[in-house]
């Protein structure tokens, strides 16, 4: 900005010039003339300052220079607009502009893509650290047949075979997972290493699932009413005895009105509003739950009560009149008193969290974020978290993994942990000042940890001395080679389903395929009971029974036969943040990863401190309370529920053992066909051996990266493609979008191959517009208000429309070809499977729905392919930069507003 010439009335005016060092006419200074109100912008010589021609506020009025006075006139006060940083990414393309060639994030990290000679199929992906993944395809069908990556000189490879476009085998770690189908194409049986685990029998005429028979000899049989709704379910034991598990009664709208759990004896009745949202639950044991919604169909709050004691929780959302962002949560109230308040920056990132322990006691956590490569560019990666005189700071590698964490204590002392990862982002080493040791981890080509060595604390990258402690892991040499056979010489045996029977001094019994029923040994006698959705509702340990009262998978309250009761409270993301015990409120202190590090009372006094290793094993527990609060509190590492008696975490469908760093039992085989482009096919792994920033709340093989909410645009596509159409949880973190995930190689559209897959391209074009329209619908779906179909339809329709009016009209032909109808049927089958509560059936129906989604995506892609790359680039740039342009698509289609957060 320079003083340059005069206007027609002789006033000096300004123009843009190329910057030149030392040019006198380019030097200005800012002088505050009214605190908080404005500045005078004064030339270097001090005689002239910026003014507006004729004091005009009209568009195109000249900015001029007039004589400067010590007391500047009001018309010469300049209000400096607060300008936020930006997030940005960039893409380059192949020479024919058909495919992305590189994607670079805000930190300058780049992922490279290579394709076949026709630029159709992705053959190689090289992440930002130079690790390459190669892909091979069937020459006739383009089906992916192999995924491979080199890790420390060893090839990690997954292979696929197909029949009639269905996966029939997956090769991994020297054995295969096998899938068999009936003549109608329905999944009939699954096997591991040549041993059949379960078989599904359908009703006549390609009907619903009649029963599932497990390798242990048990079976689950379904019973339906005349409307083909699941009316009852039975467990058939190995000796042929039949036990009825539950009964369902439906209302005239097809929703469950009454559910009788015959195992616990509890009867639940449900109430819905006029648009089908669940607003109330009454249980025969006295538990009552009520929910209310706001005008945007978000859960505004809920109340629950048992034995005349209850609580009210209210979620506070952004209010435009208060200059808040309406799509974000601004706080939580408990019984009318605000307990959490959030502050955001211009990009929608949390910068402060205020915890109100009482009216007079508050603590504040402040967040800063990692800067981008250039000035003014930022990211969603958290750089530091500060609370009072205590702080944590973080750095990241090029793939977005946490590289260092420095913890500064209240006394000013600092302790540092440095993490190292291999080409699969598995944790291979940590230099841990907190534990005063260096720990190294070694894995086989199946991802199984084979050795854990501990040394004195060493910062040198090369370790030459011998470890002072080693843990060894030995695995099956045949069949299911991912099964841990010996841990430090202790033998582990398994049943036919892959569940452990003898485990580190304990004996275990299982039922319904994968549910842990009874544990004995080492002074422990523990029984567990589950509901129809497979969630644990009761445990009895050495004669003391604890009942869990759930809202979905969240434990609202637990009561024990010893007379104790604990209530738990959750934020708007579903993370537990407080508890009430013996009529006193307590609050959790957490780190960035969600680990509960301490418990504070209503005065802000820390009564309990926890310390874990990287895998969640409790190292130290300090308890200053007078009521044993440290042991009574069940939520610990990552906010998981910890069974103190068992020494394991319960993750809502499976148990996780922090001693071995592995899941106790395998996930269902059907999940393996969801991510065909991934090398992660080990059903026993916890978070793919990256426990630092990954989390597994529900015990499923699919997990999310937490740090900085670093789900980028492609992470959003992945989540939509795999979750939204199946009525699964749609991650709230999608509103906090960064670029780290897609640069770390998280470019896969789950179930449909790498970036170039049809559904990824189709949904990719409309992802932002689809989210804009589908977000409120999802909120309804999340709380039972609408079906997944409503959300799916919205995203698909808008996803098509983003390419323009011509493409939008193709929706009708898609309807005519029956693709939408078939998807609706698949969603119906999936929801019925969910009602049945069997994970195997659920996963099978989800896989079927994924395949139907792919077919629909391919059809959409045919009509939108010419413009998908440019549209997707707009999506990426606008999402990660936080801008909000209004785009008029080609062909006169709808105007699309990109979301801003």
Task: Write out the residue ranges for each language-model feature.
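Lectin-like carbohydrate-binding module/patch detector with strong preference for beta-trefoil
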Residues: 1-84
């Amino acid at each position: 900005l320079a003083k340059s010439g005069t206007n027609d009335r002789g006033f000096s005016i300004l123009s843009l010039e190329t910057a030149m060092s030392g040019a006198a006419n380019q030097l200005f200074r800012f002088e505050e003339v009214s605190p908080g109100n404005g500045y005078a912008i004064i030339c270097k010589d001090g005689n002239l300052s910026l003014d507006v021609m004729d004091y005009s506020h009209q568009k195109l009025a000249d900015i001029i220079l007039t004589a400067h006075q010590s007391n500047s006139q009001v018309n010469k006060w300049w209000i400096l607009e607060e300008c936020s940083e930006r997030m940005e990414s960039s893409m380059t393309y192949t020479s024919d502009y058909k495919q992305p060639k590189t994607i670079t994030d805000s930190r300058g990290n780049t992922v490279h893509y290579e394709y076949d000679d026709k630029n159709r199929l992705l053959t190689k992906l090289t992440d930002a650290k130079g690790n390459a993944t190669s892909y091979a395809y069937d020459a006739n069908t383009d089906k992916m047949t192999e995924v491979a990556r080199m890790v420390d000189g060893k090839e990690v490879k997954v292979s696929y075979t197909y029949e009639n476009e269905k996966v029939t085998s997956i090769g991994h770690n020297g054995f295969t997972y096998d899938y068999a189908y009936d003549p109608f194409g329905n999944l009939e049986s699954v096997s591991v290493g040549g041993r059949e685990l379960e078989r599904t029998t359908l009703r006549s005429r390609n009907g619903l699932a009649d029963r599932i028979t497990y390798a242990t000899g048990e079976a689950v049989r379904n019973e339906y009413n005349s409307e083909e709704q699941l009316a009852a379910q039975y467990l058939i034991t190995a000796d042929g005895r039949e036990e009825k598990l539950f009964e369902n009664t439906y209302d005239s709208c097809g929703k469950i009105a009454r559910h009788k759990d015959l195992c616990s004896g509890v009867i639940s009745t449900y109430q819905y509003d006029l648009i089908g949202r669940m607003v109330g639950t009454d249980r025969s044991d006295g538990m009552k739950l009520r929910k209310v919604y706001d005008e945007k169909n978000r859960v505004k709050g809920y109340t629950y009560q048992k034995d005349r004691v209850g609580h009210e929780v209210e979620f506070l959302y952004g209010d435009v009149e208060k200059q808040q962002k309406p799509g974000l949560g601004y706080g939580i109230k408990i019984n009318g008193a605000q307990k959490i308040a959030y502050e955001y920056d211009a990009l929608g990132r949390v910068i402060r969290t205020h915890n109100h322990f009482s009216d007079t006691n508050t603590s504040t956590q402040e967040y800063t974020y990692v800067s981008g490569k250039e000035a003014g560019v930022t990211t969603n990666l958290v750089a530091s978290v500060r609370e009072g005189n205590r702080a944590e700071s973080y750095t990241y590698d090029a793939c977005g993994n946490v590289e260092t964490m420095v913890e500064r204590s209240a006394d000013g002392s600092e302790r540092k942990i440095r993490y190292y990862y291999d080409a699969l982002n598995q944790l291979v080493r940590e230099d841990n000042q907190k534990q005063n040791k260096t720990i190294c981890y070694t894995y086989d080509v199946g991802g199984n940890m084979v050795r854990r060595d501990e040394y004195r604390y060493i910062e040198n990258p090369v370790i030459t001395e011998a470890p002072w402690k080693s843990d060894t892991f030995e695995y099956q040499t045949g069949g299911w080679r991912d099964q841990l056979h010996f841990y430090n010489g202790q033998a582990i045996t398994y049943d036919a389903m892959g569940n452990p029977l003898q485990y580190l001094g304990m004996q275990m019994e299982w039922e319904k395929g994968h549910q842990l029923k009874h544990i004995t040994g080492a002074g422990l006698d523990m029984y567990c009971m589950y509901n129809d959705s497979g969630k644990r509702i009761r445990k009895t340990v050495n004669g003391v029974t604890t009942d869990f009262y759930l809202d979905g998978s969240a434990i609202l309250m637990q009561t024990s036969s010893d007379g104790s009761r604990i209530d738990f409270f959750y934020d708007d993301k579903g993370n537990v943040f407080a508890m009430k015990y013996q009529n006193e409120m307590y609050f959790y202190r957490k780190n960035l990863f969600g680990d509960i590090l301490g418990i504070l009372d209503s005065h802000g006094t820390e009564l309990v401190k926890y310390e874990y290793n990287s895998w969640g094993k409790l190292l130290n527990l300090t308890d200053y309370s007078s009521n044993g609060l440290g042991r009574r509190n069940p939520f610990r590492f990552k906010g998981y529920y910890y069974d103190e008696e068992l020494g394991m975490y319960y993750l809502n469908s499976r148990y996780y053992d922090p001693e071995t760093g592995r899941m106790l039992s395998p996930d269902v085989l059907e999940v393996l066909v969801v991510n065909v482009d991934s090398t992660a096919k080990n059903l026993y792994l916890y978070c793919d051996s990256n426990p630092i920033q990954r989390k597994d709340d529900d015990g499923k093989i699919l997990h999310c990266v937490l740090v900085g909410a670093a789900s980028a645009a492609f992470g959003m596509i992945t989540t939509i493609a795999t979750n939204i159409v199946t009525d699964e949880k749609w991650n709230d973190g999608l509103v906090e979008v960064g670029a780290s995930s897609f640069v770390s190689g998280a470019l896969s559209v789950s179930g449909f191959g790498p970036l170039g897959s049809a559904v990824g391209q189709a949904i990719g074009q409309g992802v932002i517009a689809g989210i804009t329209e589908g977000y409120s619908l999802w909120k309804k779906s999340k709380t039972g208000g609408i079906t997944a179909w409503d959300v799916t339809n919205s995203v698909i329709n808008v996803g098509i429309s983003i390419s323009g009016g011509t493409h939008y009209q193709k929706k009708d032909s898609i309807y005519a070809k029956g693709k939408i109808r078939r998807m609706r049927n698949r969603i119906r089958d999936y929801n019925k499977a969910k009602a049945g509560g069997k994970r195997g059936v659920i996963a099978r129906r989800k896989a079927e729905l994924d395949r139907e989604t792919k077919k629909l995506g391919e059809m959409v892609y045919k009509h939108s392919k010419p413009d998908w790359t440019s549209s997707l680039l707009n999506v990426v740039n606008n999402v990660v930069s936080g801008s909000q342009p209004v785009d008029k698509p080609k062909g006169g289609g709808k105007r699309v507003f990109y979301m801003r957060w």
